[in-house]
Amino acid sequence: DDVVCFWKPDGEYQGWRNTLHGGIQATLLDETAAWVVFRKLQVMGVTSKLELSYRRPVLTTDSQITLRGHITEQKRNLAYVELTLENSKGEVCTTARAVYYLFTQEKSKENGFTGCGTEDEELLF
């Protein structure tokens, strides 16, 4: 199942007039991929590779955008994450594929990661 994030764009993040800058879109998708790894695998990870396809403009005047991501594969210390950025109409504007290098649970704890739960959930660490 997907990790879902919501964000409200505004004019200070535009590249072209009323259009969300592609670098901001990349940042949002990369950050969503990180939360997918944190939440689903309960370890830290860092971006190894990020590929984006810009399919349609994202308007900074849009009321809200939705970011979705899920793990498609995990091999050893790598997680493969597929992501979408949708406008308020539910149209897919940008897609991304990320490869995340995964830290071990021990290394994650050494770096201060204690797990990623929800407000109504108790983590068993």
Question: Where in this protein do the model-derived segments appear?
Answer:
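A short beta-loop-beta micro-motif enriched in histidine and acidic residues
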Residues: 19-24, 41
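HotDog/MaoC-like acyl-thioester-processing domains
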Residues: 58-61, 71-125
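Hydrophobic residues in beta-strands and at strand termini
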Residues: 7-9, 54, 102
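Short amphipathic alpha-helical face segments that pack within enzyme cores
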Residues: 24-28, 32
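A generic structural signal for beta-strand entry/edge sites
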Residues: 1-4, 64, 78
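Hydrophobic beta-strand-centered segment that forms part of the acyl-chain substrate-binding groove
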Residues: 32-66, 71, 97
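Catalytic strand-loop segment that frames the active site of acyl-thioester-processing enzymes
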Residues: 1-20
